[in-house]
Amino acid sequence: MIYEHGGDLDKAINKYGGKKEQWIDLSTGINPNSYPHSDINITEFRNLPSKSDILKLNEIAKRSFQTNASVSSLMGAQAAINILPVLFPIGNITILEPTYNEYNKVFSDFSRNIITVRTLHELKNSQIAILCNPNNPDGRLYSNEDLIELSKNVQVLIIDESFIDQYPEYSLSTKINNQTNNIIILRSFGKFF
């Protein structure tokens, strides 16, 4: 099951009333007053991206995020979160909380054993450890050193860096190498672009 992730104004209007133009939808991160891109060819929106388009996009992402790690482009961090239970069909899931609740929801849908913890130290010895850096909603930050050390003590470390652009020195994406091949980092292109 894929959970709703904002943007359903009809549902909100049915529950709370009002008209669409009276609502400000902050749930999607889409600017209702976007920049007028008059130089974009509309035909670009009529075709699915080609393999070469995707490879080019991944190279741009690698440069933008200053990483040599493998990159996969998806339709947002939420799309990545939704496929995690399929990528990791076995193993206990340990989530550092409080945090973005979609991790718990998607793994619960797959009847996974979920353990919630409150400190970075409690993630040690996890099969699959999940945290946000900075954390959503409280903004906690974790150092690169602490995260690399943690990665040595878990089977898989998933780090959601969707809001890291404000703190580039805390991003682990520039530190990924063949010694850290058990780390998966989720980055978001649209949060601050």
Regions found by a protein language model. Give the residues of each.
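N-terminal "arm"/small-domain region of PLP-dependent enzymes with the aminotransferase-like
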Residues: 1-53
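Hydrophobic/aromatic beta-strand patches that form the interior of the parallel beta-sheet core
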Residues: 22-26, 72, 94, 115, ...
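Redox-cofactor binding/interface segments in oxidoreductases and associated redox assembly factors
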Residues: 28, 95, 130-131, 159, ...
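Short glycine-rich anion-binding loops that position phosphate/pyrophosphate groups of nucleotides
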Residues: 29-35, 77, 133-137, 164, ...
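Glycine/Thr-rich phosphate-binding loops of Rossmann-like dinucleotide-binding domains
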Residues: 34-36, 81-82, 103-104, 138-139, ...
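Conserved beta-loop-alpha segment that forms the PLP phosphate-binding cup at the N-terminus of a helix
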Residues: 55, 68-93
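PLP-dependent aminotransferase-like
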Residues: 86-144
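Active-site pre-lysine segment of PLP-dependent enzymes
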Residues: 108, 120, 124, 137-157, ...
